[in-house]
A protein has these predicted regions:
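Clamp-loader machinery-focused feature within the broader ASCE/P-loop NTPase space
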Residues: 1-77, 81
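Charged, glycine-rich active-site and insertion segments that engage polyanionic ligands
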Residues: 1-31, 88-91, 96-150
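Loop/turn-to-beta-strand initiation segments
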Residues: 59-64, 87-93
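CheY-like receiver
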Residues: 72, 80-83, 103, 110
Length: 150
């Protein structure tokens, strides 16, 4: 389970979201993304809603999930302060397809990790108990996506 704010970089935002949500405690998360036709861009309107939601007090951890292939510059600037100093019990999860979609100042404020989402069909093809060490190693190498600089 995720215990601190972070940036998730994945090729398929919807698939990762479908894997993440069941791992979170029930009724503790809010997802913010552009619901318009071109829902790739995270806009200033979503940023304002995120800030408003973050300041609603909660005695338990609340996960605020921001999804977008691209984040408008104005939206990112609006979020800077709250990402740097989040209210008590607020955990931000930014999900995007590329690190370059975010300002360097946002990337410097939150840890980030690359996730290769596997669909259920891919999972079912790999029974770890029937694999030898070499096959497991090759599978892990094939699915690893971390650069030297990270």
């Amino acid at each position: 389970m995720i215990t601190n704010s972070q940036i998730i970089i994945t090729k398929d935002i919807d698939l990762y979201l479908s894997e993440l949500v069941p791992t979170l405690p029930l009724h503790t998360h809010r997802i913010f993304q552009n619901e318009e036709e071109n829902k790739d861009n995270f806009k200033i309107e979503q940023a304002k809603k995120v800030i408003k939601e973050a300041y609603i007090a909660s005695s338990e951890s609340k996960y605020i999930i921001l999804c977008g292939n691209k984040f408008e510059l104005e939206a990112q600037n609006k979020l800077l302060k709250i990402l740097e100093e989040p209210p008590k019990n607020i955990i931000f999860i930014i999900i995007t397809t590329s690190k370059s979609n975010l300002l360097p100042t946002i990337i410097s404020r939150l840890p980030h990790k690359y996730i290769k989402s596997l669909n259920k069909k891919e999972y079912s093809n790999h029974n770890i108990f029937k694999k030898d060490l070499k096959d497991i190693y090759l599978f892990l190498k094939e699915n690893q996506r971390i650069s030297k600089n990270d």
